[in-house]
C-alpha cells in the first residue's frame, strides 16, 4: 500500500534526477507513484527553502528511502513484536531496516519530518516513534484491508495512541486482582480435584480481563447484550469470572451434584461444555451475558453463536443493519483449530452477507503454540494461526499473553474498530499451555523443550505482580496478601459446600411430561383467500417474467380448482403465521426461488432487476416479519447459524433448506451434536425445521437420498420430529403445528421432489381450512371393502404415488401412508391394522436400499402394531453401499420391480396368526 515508488531505493541519484526532469516537462510521462513522490519532494523544497528539488537528487533519494521505511514499518512492524512469553525471538523483516530502502540510520536525520507529513523533527524521530507504535507491544496487520477509510483509521488511531495508552494505576491493580482470581481458581481446582480434566486457562490467564474490557467497552458503545462462543480451554474460568457462575455451582459440577432433572430429558454434559446466562453492571447499564453451550467439536459453535446474536439483534430492534451495536458477539478460538477447521472460513464468509451479518464479531485466538501434541509446523501452512482471517479482510492484532497492558489495549482498539465499521476483528493472544492438553496428560512426551521452558516460566499473575512491584505500585508483600485473600475466600466456599448435604437425586427428579395436545392448525377459507390475493399483487409497473407470471397466476384459481401445490401451500402457511404475529425466517442455497423453481418467494423485475417479496408485504399489525435469503454454498455454517437463531428466537419459525437432501450430511456435526442432543445435554431447545428434498427419480447416488435412516437412528426421548408429508395440505398443517406448538422440537421434513407439482398430490382449500396434520393416512379407496384386502402396504409419500399410479382396479392391496415417522404413531397404525380383518401380510415398501431408509426403524414398530400376529415383509432395494443407481435405465428397472412386487396378489399360503408369537 506504499504511496511511494517501490523501486526508488535501488536507483542512483542520477536516475532520480533524470526522472524528475521528465516529470517537469510532462508529469503524465512518469508513473503516478513517481508523480506523487515528486510532488512531495517539491513541497519539501518549498518548506526548506531549497532551489528546485531536482537540483538535490540525494535529498530526493533520502526522502524516498525514509518514506519507504515508514511504509514498511506500518506493513511489517508486527514481525518485530516480541509475542512469545517463553522468549522465542520475533522473525523480523529485512524491510524494517533503513539499508533495504537505500538509506542509513544517520541519513534519516537529514530529512525534515515535514517532508513526510509530520509537524516537527526529522525522519529519524518519526521512524523512532513509529517503531514504538508498530514494533512495540501490539503487532497490527491492517494493510490488507481493502477499504482505505479503515486503513487510515488504524494509522490514525495507532499513531495518536489514545486507545493504546498504558493502563492507569487503578486499572493495573484491578488486573492484578483479576489475574489472582483466575490463577487462584485453577490452582485450587488442581489441589481439590487432582486428576480431573478441566482444560485450564493457565498460560493465557489474560483472556478473562480481556473479556472484561470487551464487555465494558461494548456497553459504552451501546451494547446491551454479549453473546459468546468458545471451546473447552479456559471455559471454567470464563464461566465463573465472566458469566457469574458461583464457585459453589462450579464445585458441584466436579462433585457430580446435578441440579433438577427430569426422568426423560436430561443426561447432561461435562462441565467444560456448559452454557450459561448471566448479567453484569457497567455503570448504570445492565449487560446480559450468554455463553453458548458447545460440544468438543472445535469451532463448530461459531456459526451457532452468530445466529444467536443475529436473533437477539432482531428482537432488540436491529433490522437491515440498524442497531447492531445492541449485541456484541465474542468468539474465542484455538490456535490449532482456527486454521484447521473448515467451519471457520465458512463462518467468516457469512460476516458481510445481508442475511447473516451481525455487525462485526470480536474474535480472540487463545494461542497455546501447540494443538494437543501437534506443533505449529505440522498444524498450519501459514506463519500466523490467524492468517486465514486476512482473506476476509479482517484486521489482526497480535499480543503477548504476559503483557496485560498490550492485551487490554488491543481489546480497546478492536471494539472501537467494530463500533466504527461494524466488521469482524481478531486478536491473536500468544501464550502457552501450562499443562498438557488436559491435566492428566504429560506434554513433555512430545514437546520436551517447550515444556522445560514452561516449567521455568512464572505465571501471568507472577509476571504482572513483579511488573507492578518494579513500578513501585505495590510491594511483594501486598501481592502475596492479595493472593492469600483469594485463596482463603475460595477455600471457605469449598468447605461450606462440603458441609452442605447433597439433596437426593431421586427427590429432584420430576416425572416425565406428557406431550401437549396439538394446536389447531386449520385456517378459515376467507383468510386464506385474502392472503392468496395479497401474494399475487405486484408493485405498480413491476414486470414479472412471462413464464413465471403464468405459473403464479394459476395460484389465483387453485384455491377453487383443488390444485394447491407444494409451494402454494407453503406460502399460505407462512402468510397465515405472519398474520398470527409469528416471524418466519427461511434460508438455504437457492431458497428464494427454490431449487426446483417451486417457491418463488422473491420475484424479479425482468427489466430493472428490482426484487419483490410478497410475503413481506402482508399486514404486520401483530408483528410477524418474513425473511428469506439465498445462503452461500455452505451447509455446516448456515445450518449452524439457523440453529443458533432458532434457540434465541424460540417463537419464530426458522427453516433451513438443503439444495438437495443428499448434502445435509455436510452439516452432520450440527445435527449430531446440537439438533438431536441439545435438550438432553444442555436443556437447550430449538424448533429449527430442516427441509430436505428426498426421493428416487433417477438423479443418481448424490441427488436421491437425504439419509432418512440417520435421522431415525438419532431419534429418542421425543428429541425431534421426523416426517415425510404426502400432500401440500399435510405440509401446510405440519408447518403451522410446528410454529404454534408451545414446546417445540426440531422438525426434519423429507421433501418429495417429484410431488411438488404432481396433480395427484394436490390439495384443496378445504384440506387447509379443516382438520390438521395426520401422522398416518389410511387408504380411502378401499374403505368400503376392507374385508377383501389381503395385503396392507405401509409406505411414505413418494412411494405411495408410484404405487397408486400402478395399482389395478379391484386389487386386494391397501396403501397406507406414514407421514410422521418419529414419534412413531403406534396407536394409529395399530388401529388401522385392526380394521383389515383378513390380512395375510403387512409390507413396508420403500425406494431406499434395505440398509437405508426407514425399514430398520419401522420393522420392530410394525411387529408391535400387529401384535406379532402377521408376517412383516420388506420390499424395496436390496442392501447396498451406495444409495441409488447412477444410470437412469437401471433406476427405472429397479423402480418398476419394487412396484410390481408390492402390488402382486398377497400369498394365500400365509394366514393370519391366531395367537401372538
What label would you give each PLM region?
Residues 371-382, 390-426, 430-436, 444:
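Conserved phosphate-handling catalytic cores of large alpha/beta enzymes
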Residues 61-71, 78-108, 113, 125-128, ...:
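Flexible, glycine-rich loop/tail regions that form catalytic "lids" or insertion modules at the edges
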Residues 7-10, 57, 198-205, 288-299, ...:
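Alpha-helix capping and helix-loop boundary segments enriched in small/acidic/polar residues
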Residues 184, 188-248, 550-557, 564-578, ...:
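Active-site pocket-lining segments that scaffold enzyme catalytic pockets across diverse folds
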Residues 163-185, 256-317, 322, 614-615, ...:
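Active-site cores of enzymes that catalyze phosphoryl transfer or operate on phosphate-rich substrates
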Residues 224-397, 596-649:
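Cofactor-binding active-site loop characterized by glycine-rich and histidine/acidic residues
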Residues 1-40:
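Subset of Sec-pathway N-terminal targeting signals
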Amino acid at each position: 500500500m506504499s504511496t511511494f515508488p517501490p523501486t526508488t531505493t535501488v536507483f542512483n541519484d542520477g536516475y532520480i534526477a533524470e526522472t524528475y526532469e521528465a516529470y517537469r516537462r510532462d508529469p503524465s510521462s512518469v508513473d503516478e507513484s513517481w508523480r506523487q513522490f515528486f510532488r512531495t519532494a517539491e513541497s519539501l523544497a518549498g518548506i526548506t527553502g531549497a532551489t528546485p528539488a531536482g537540483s538535490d537528487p540525494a535529498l530526493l533519494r533520502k526522502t524516498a528511502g525514509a518514506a519507504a521505511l515508514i511504509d514498511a514499518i506500518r506493513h511489517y512492524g508486527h514481525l518485530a513484536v516480541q509475542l512469545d512469553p517463553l522468549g522465542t525471538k520475533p522473525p523480523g523483516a529485512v524491510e524494517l531496516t533503513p539499508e533495504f530502502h537505500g538509506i542509513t540510520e544517520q541519513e534519516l536525520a537529514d530529512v525534515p519530518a515535514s517532508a513526510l507529513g509530520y509537524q516537527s523533527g526529522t525522519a529519524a524521530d518519526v521512524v523512532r516513534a513509529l517503531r514504538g507504535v508498530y514494533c512495540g507491544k501490539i503487532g497490527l496487520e491492517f494493510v490488507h484491508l481493502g477499504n482505505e477509510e479503515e486503513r487510515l483509521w488504524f494509522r490514525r488511531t495507532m499513531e495518536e495512541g489514545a486507545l493504546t495508552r498504558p493502563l492507569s494505576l487503578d486499572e493495573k491493580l484491578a488486573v492484578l486482582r483479576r489475574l489472582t482470581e483466575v490463577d487462584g481458581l485453577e490452582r485450587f481446582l488442581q489441589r481439590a480435584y487432582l486428576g480431573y480434566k478441566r482444560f485450564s486457562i493457565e498460560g493465557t490467564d489474560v483472556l478473562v480481563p480481556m473479556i472484561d474490557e470487551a464487555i465494558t467497552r461494548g456497553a459504552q458503545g451501546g451494547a446491551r447484550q454479549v453473546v459468546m462462543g468458545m471451546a473447552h480451554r479456559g471455559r471454567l474460568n470464563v464461566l465463573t469470572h465472566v458469566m457469574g457462575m458461583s464457585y459453589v455451582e462450579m464445585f458441584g459440577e466436579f462433585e457430580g451434584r446435578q441440579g433438577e432433572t427430569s426422568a426423560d430429558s436430561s443426561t447432561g454434559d461435562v462441565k467444560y461444555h456448559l452454557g450459561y446466562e448471566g448479567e453484569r453492571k457497567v455503570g448504570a447499564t445492565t449487560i446480559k451475558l450468554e455463553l453458548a453451550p458447545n460440544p468438543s467439536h472445535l469451532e463448530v459453535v461459531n456459526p451457532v453463536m452468530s445466529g444467536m446474536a443475529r436473533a437477539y439483534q432482531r428482537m432488540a430492534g436491529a433490522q437491515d443493519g440498524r442497531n447492531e451495536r445492541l449485541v456484541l458477539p465474542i468468539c474465542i478460538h484455538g490456535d490449532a483449530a482456527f486454521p484447521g477447521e473448515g467451519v471457520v472460513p465458512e463462518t467468516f464468509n457469512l460476516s458481510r452477507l445481508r442475511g447473516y451479518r451481525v455487525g462485526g464479531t470480536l474474535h480472540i485466538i487463545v494461542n497455546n503454540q501447540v494443538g494437543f501434541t501437534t506443533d505449529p509446523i505440522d498444524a498450519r501452512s501459514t506463519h500466523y494461526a490467524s492468517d486465514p482471517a486476512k482473506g476476509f479482510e479482517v484486521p489482526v492484532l497480535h499480543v503477548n499473553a504476559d503483557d496485560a497492558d498490550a492485551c487490554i489495549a488491543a481489546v480497546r482498539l478492536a471494539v472501537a474498530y467494530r463500533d466504527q465499521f461494524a466488521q469482524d476483528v481478531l486478536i491473536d493472544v500468544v501464550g502457552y499451555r501450562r499443562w498438557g492438553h488436559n491435566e492428566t496428560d504429560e506434554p513433555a512426551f512430545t514437546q520436551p523443550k517447550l515444556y522445560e521452558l514452561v516449567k521455568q516460566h512464572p505465571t501471568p499473575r507472577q509476571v504482572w505482580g513483579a511488573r507492578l512491584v518494579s513500578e513501585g505500585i505495590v510491594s511483594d508483600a501486598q501481592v502475596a496478601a492479595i493472593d492469600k485473600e483469594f485463596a482463603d475466600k475460595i477455600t471457605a466456599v469449598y468447605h461450606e459446600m462440603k458441609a452442605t448435604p447433597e439433596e437426593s437425586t431421586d427427590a429432584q427428579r420430576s416425572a416425565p411430561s406428557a406431550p401437549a395436545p396439538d394446536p389447531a392448525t386449520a385456517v378459515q377459507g376467507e383468510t386464506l383467500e385474502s392472503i392468496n390475493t395479497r401474494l399475487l399483487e405486484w408493485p405498480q409497473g413491476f414486470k414479472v417474467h412471462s413464464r413465471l407470471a403464468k405459473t403464479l397466476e394459476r395460484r389465483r384459481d387453485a384455491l377453487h380448482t383443488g390444485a394447491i401445490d407444494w409451494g402454494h401451500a407453503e406460502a399460505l402457511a407462512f402468510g397465515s403465521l405472519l398474520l398470527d404475529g409469528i416471524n418466519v425466517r427461511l434460508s438455504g442455497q437457492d431458497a428464494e426461488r427454490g431449487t426446483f423453481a417451486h417457491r418463488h418467494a422473491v420475484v424479479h423485475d425482468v427489466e430493472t432487476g428490482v426484487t419483490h417479496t410478497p410475503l413481506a408485504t402482508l399486514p404486520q399489525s401483530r408483528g410477524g416479519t418474513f425473511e428469506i435469503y439465498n445462503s452461500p454454498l455452505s451447509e455446516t455454517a448456515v445450518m449452524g447459524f439457523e440453529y443458533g437463531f432458532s434457540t434465541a428466537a424460540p417463537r419464530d419459525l426458522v427453516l433451513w433448506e438443503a439444495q438437495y437432501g443428499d448434502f445435509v450430511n455436510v452439516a452432520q456435526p450440527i445435527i449430531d451434536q446440537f439438533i438431536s442432543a441439545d435438550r438432553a445435554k444442555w436443556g437447550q431447545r430449538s424448533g429449527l425445521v430442516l427441509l430436505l428434498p428426498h426421493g428416487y427419480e433417477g438423479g443418481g447416488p448424490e441427488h436421491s437420498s437425504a439419509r432418512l435412516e440417520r435421522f431415525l437412528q438419532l431419534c429418542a426421548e421425543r428429541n425431534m420430529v421426523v416426517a415425510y408429508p404426502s400432500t401440500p395440505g399435510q405440509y401446510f398443517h405440519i408447518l403451522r403445528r410446528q410454529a404454534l406448538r408451545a414446546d417445540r422440537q426440531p422438525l426434519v421434513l423429507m421433501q418429495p421432489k417429484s410431488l411438488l407439482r404432481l396433480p395427484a398430490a394436490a390439495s384443496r382449500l378445504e384440506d387447509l381450512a379443516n382438520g390438521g396434520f395426520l401422522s398416518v393416512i389410511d387408504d380411502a379407496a378401499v374403505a368400503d371393502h376392507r374385508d377383501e384386502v389381503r395385503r396392507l402396504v405401509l409406505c411414505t409419500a413418494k412411494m405411495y404415488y408410484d404405487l397408486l399410479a400402478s395399482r389395478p382396479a379391484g386389487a386386494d392391496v391397501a396403501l397406507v401412508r406414514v407421514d410422521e415417522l418419529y414419534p412413531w404413531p403406534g396407536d394409529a397404525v395399530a388401529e388401522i391394522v385392526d380394521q383389515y380383518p383378513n390380512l395375510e401380510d403387512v409390507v413396508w415398501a420403500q425406494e431406499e436400499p434395505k440398509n437405508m431408509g426407514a425399514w430398520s426403524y419401522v420393522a420392530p414398530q410394525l411387529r408391535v402394531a400387529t401384535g406379532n400376529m402377521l408376517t412383516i415383509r420388506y420390499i424395496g432395494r436390496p442392501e447396498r453401499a451406495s444409495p441409488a443407481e447412477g444410470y437412469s435405465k437401471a433406476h427405472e428397472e429397479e423402480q418398476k420391480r419394487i412396484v410390481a412386487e408390492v402390488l402382486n396378489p398377497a400369498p394365500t399360503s400365509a394366514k393370519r396368526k391366531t395367537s401372538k408369537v
